[in-house]
From Swiss-Prot:
PANTHER family: TRANSLATION INITIATION FACTOR IF-1, CHLOROPLASTIC (PTHR33370:SF1). Residues 1-71 form the S1-like domain. One of the essential components for the initiation of protein synthesis. Stabilizes the binding of IF-2 and IF-3 on the 30S subunit to which N-formylmethionyl-tRNA(fMet) subsequently binds. Helps modulate mRNA selection, yielding the 30S pre-initiation complex (PIC). Upon addition of the 50S ribosomal subunit IF-1, IF-2 and IF-3 are released leaving the mature 70S translation initiation complex. Belongs to the IF-1 family. CDD domains: S1_IF1 (cd04451). GO terms for molecular function: ribosome binding; rRNA binding; translation initiation factor activity. Component of the 30S ribosomal translation pre-initiation complex which assembles on the 30S ribosome in the order IF-2 and IF-3, IF-1 and N-formylmethionyl-tRNA(fMet); mRNA recruitment can occur at any time during PIC assembly. This is Translation initiation factor IF-1, chloroplastic. The lineage of its organism: Eukaryota, Viridiplantae, Streptophyta, Embryophyta, Tracheophyta.
Length: 77
């Protein structure tokens, strides 16, 4: 039986060593996120300020896997 996971969107607030990031979810929870293998193999850069999709286990809601980096919404600079 496959483990059920929640998918959230959030904002990267801090970059930590070894592909780990501090992520503030849209519901204001602060969790630790790590980069999934596909993102790591594709050399996708994730920086503080990026919006991401993160998959959180129901058993440990303090850690999650970053599964997608969202595109910026046509920012007006």
């Amino acid at each position: 039986m496959k483990e059920q996971k929640w998918t959230h969107e959030g904002l990267i607030t801090e970059s930590l060593p070894n592909g780990m990031f501090r992520v503030r979810l849209d519901n204001e929870d602060l969790i630790l996120g790590y980069v999934s293998g596909k993102i790591r193999r594709s050399f996708i850069r994730i920086l503080p300020g990026d919006r991401v999709k993160i998959e959180v286990s129901r058993y440990d809601s303090t850690r999650g896997r970053i599964i997608y980096r969202l595109r910026n919404k046509d920012s007006k600079d």
